[in-house]
Amino acid sequence: MPVDKNLRDLEPGIHTDLEGRLTYGGYLRLDQLLSAQQPLSEPAHHDEMLFIIQHQTSELWLKLLAHELRAAIVHLQRDEVWQCRKVLARSKQVLRQLTEQWSVLETLTPSEYMGFRDVLGPSSGFQSLQYRYIEFLLGNKNPQMLQVFAYDPAGQARLREVLEAPSLYEEFLRYLARFGHAIPQQYQARDWTAAHVADDTLRPVFERIYENTDRYWREYSLCEDLVDVETQFQLWRFRHMRTVMRVIGFKRGTGGSSGVGFLQQALALTFFPELFDVRTSVGVDNRPPQGSADAGKR
């Protein structure tokens, strides 16, 4: 149907009798959502709205990411590989969205930010319960982080629950054990509150998978999905650190951290270390060469 005079007529079937019925705004509770942006600067600094919306939308994406990662864990517990891969694929896209979102905040200049930074007080993204929840789901367990949420007993309890449960990676290791891979017994039951650290006893398991991809295609595909998730998460961390550096330089963070230096430390944290370590040894013959002093000792 052509458009006349740059106007588009309402089609006869479009609902206009919406009194008392479910509407778009009602379903999404937009009255509540769009009234949650309340600048504290007086008079309201123009750029504080950007700062608020950046972080509020990040929290919405984090809520979805946590939802998907919890589902991935349940699918692994049920040996539902394809369903797990589906939600991991969505998780990767959510992380990509979170990463690209930093480009909006990067338009905030140092002088603009300093125009309202004081009103933030001690509040900081470091206090994001959902971010910490996701780190715990992925395996970056750290009981010390519970101290930050002492002011919020309900939130602290939520964090403690995921801290004390197997992470996504630990459930993956248990899945591998159920399918005959030589996963050490300690991964069936251990202190789940401790962060997973690189374990050389797991390397042969992943070497076997990566050197026999046709035979272990399901396991291999899940490994690569997890690598994708960690890679995208690290890109998000990196983009966060660079955005902070761009906006405040090397000032201390509002939450009391060293700022950029503290964020740089996060880049050294890893979720699935063996999935990266195995890349060094895949296809490499680690046996001593013939004629070497060690050749006859094997």
Swiss-Prot record:
Catalysed reaction, written as an equation: L-tryptophan + O2 = N-formyl-L-kynurenine
InterPro entries: Trp/Indoleamine_2_3_dOase-like (IPR037217), Trp_2_3_dOase (IPR004981)
Gene Ontology MF, one: metal ion binding
Pathway it works in: Amino-acid degradation; L-tryptophan degradation via kynurenine pathway; L-kynurenine from L-tryptophan: step 1/2
Gene3D superfamilies the UniProt entry points to: 1.20.58.480
Enzyme Commission numbers on file: 1.13.11.11
Cofactor info, note text: Binds 1 heme group per subunit.
Highest taxon above the source species: Bacteria
Cofactor: heme
Keyword flag Metal-binding: yes
UniProt cross-references to SUPFAM superfamilies, sorted A to Z: Indolic compounds 2,3-dioxygenase-like
Enzyme class: oxidoreductase
A biological process term (GO) from this entry: L-tryptophan catabolic process to acetyl-CoA
Family that this chain belongs to: Belongs to the tryptophan 2,3-dioxygenase family.
Record text on subunit structure and interactions: Homotetramer.
Name of this chain's protein: Tryptophan 2,3-dioxygenase
The gene coding this protein: kynA
